[in-house]
Curated annotation (Swiss-Prot):
The active site is at H187. PANTHER family: MALATE DEHYDROGENASE. It comes from Psychrobacter sp. (strain PRwf-1). InterPro entries: L-lactate/malate_DH (IPR001557), Lactate/malate_DH_C (IPR022383), Lactate/malate_DH_N (IPR001236), Lactate_DH/Glyco_Ohase_4_C (IPR015955), Malate_DH_type2 (IPR010945), NAD(P)-bd_dom_sf (IPR036291). The gene is mdh. This is Malate dehydrogenase. Signal peptide: none annotated. Its EC number is 1.1.1.37. Residues 304-327 are annotated as: Disordered. GO terms for molecular function: L-malate dehydrogenase (NAD+) activity. It catalyses: (S)-malate + NAD(+) = oxaloacetate + NADH + H(+). Substrate binds at R92, R98, N131, R162. NAD(+) binds at G11, A12, A13, G14, N15, I16, S17, N105, Q112, V129, G130, N131.
Length: 327
């Protein structure tokens, strides 16, 4: 049996974590031969609820669960962490402007970035799930100057999966038949679900769907899927977000399938003309615990450029709104 790895999870008593922790403890994220120690962070008022979740984890008697830490102190939760899933974030309350939300979360993710910088493993893999995920990841990254910026990622795998599922439905195929889906940009309604490189059953996706459907139905539907779920369920997507977080980490740790890629919000070095330092979703391949942006794709069409720039613009504006709070 391998040595246990430490997996930190914030917002650990929340809905997304409740749909995620049991799957991590069962080996679904890092493999059936990898023991894990869960290091769970919550705000002080939620520690009792967290205790209940931990009791349930114990009652599952997972062979791979080598230990559980429960705390309201980030430096305890992130101590020697190999993986960190930052799920907890301030939700948008009634009458809150986006700017208020950005600032409230800036305080949370600054503190978490500092704690990661101080105590986490130097190779820690950080995934930000809590929204606004891309900018929260940027805030954490900027507060962790001793860690490689490449260690910080934001989740667009949920959008990626939504895009695959809706394309599979339209083409009467299964998600297994869909390859090379791309989500560019922000995990928000400005994201660009791009089918230019995508294939279904080995053939170009755009030859199998109507262009009008793609531009005017598919793209807005993927962009607004989160809102549609809130409308229908009366609560935001939790199980599907948990599933995407597990898939993002599993791919990062264990690698992408051959001849395919995934979408990840990662640190831009100027690829595809995107401003350096933004956390922007690109198509990525993973191997040996590292990610790499897929380069050399043709994004020169006016349609693609307009969409990629619009979501970049939103990310730049979000960064500018919190710049005064960043080191």
């Amino acid at each position: 049996m391998k040595q246990p790895v430490r997996v930190a999870v914030t917002g650990a008593a929340g809905n997304i974590s409740y749909a995620m922790l049991f799957r991590i403890a069962s080996g679904e994220m890092l493999g059936k031969d990898q023991p894990v120690i869960l290091q769970l962070l919550e705000i002080t008022p939620a520690l009792d609820a967290l205790k209940g979740v931990v009791m349930e984890l114990e009652d599952c008697a997972f062979p791979l669960l080598a230990g559980v830490v429960q705390t309201d102190d980030a430096t305890v939760a992130f101590k020697d962490a190999d993986y960190a899933l930052l799920v907890g974030a301030r939700p948008r309350g009634p009458g809150m402007e986006r700017k208020d939300l950005l600032e409230a979360n800036a305080a949370i993710f600054s503190a978490q970035g500092k704690a990661l910088n101080e105590v986490a493993s130097r190779d820690v893999k950080v995934l930000v799930v809590g929204n606004p995920a891309n900018t929260n990841a940027l805030i954490a990254q900027r507060n962790a100057p001793d860690l490689d910026p490449r260690n910080f990622t934001a989740m667009t795998r949920l959008d990626h999966n939504r895009g695959m599922a809706q394309l599979a439905e339209e083409t009467n195929s299964t998600v297994n038949d869909v390859k090379k889906m791309i989500i560019w940009g922000n995990h928000s309604s400005t994201q660009y679900p791009d089918l230019t490189e995508c294939t279904v059953n080995g053939k170009p996706a755009l030859e199998q769907v109507d262009r009008d459907w793609y531009e005017n139905s598919y793209i807005p539907s993927v962009q607004k899927r989160g809102a549609a779920i809130i409308e229908a369920r009366g609560a935001s997507s939790a199980a599907s977000a948990a599933n995407a977080a597990i898939a993002h980490m599993r791919t990062w740790a264990l690698g992408t399938d051959e001849n395919d890629w995934v979408s990840m919000g990662v640190y831009s070095q100027g690829e595809y003309g995107i401003a350096k330092g933004l956390i922007y979703s690109f198509p990525c391949t993973c191997s040996n615990g590292d990610w790499k942006i897929v380069e050399g794709l043709d994004t020169s069409s006016d349609f693609s450029q307009e969409k990629m720039k619009a979501t970049e613009q939103e990310l730049s504006e979000e960064r500018d709104a919190v710049e005064h709070l960043l080191p």
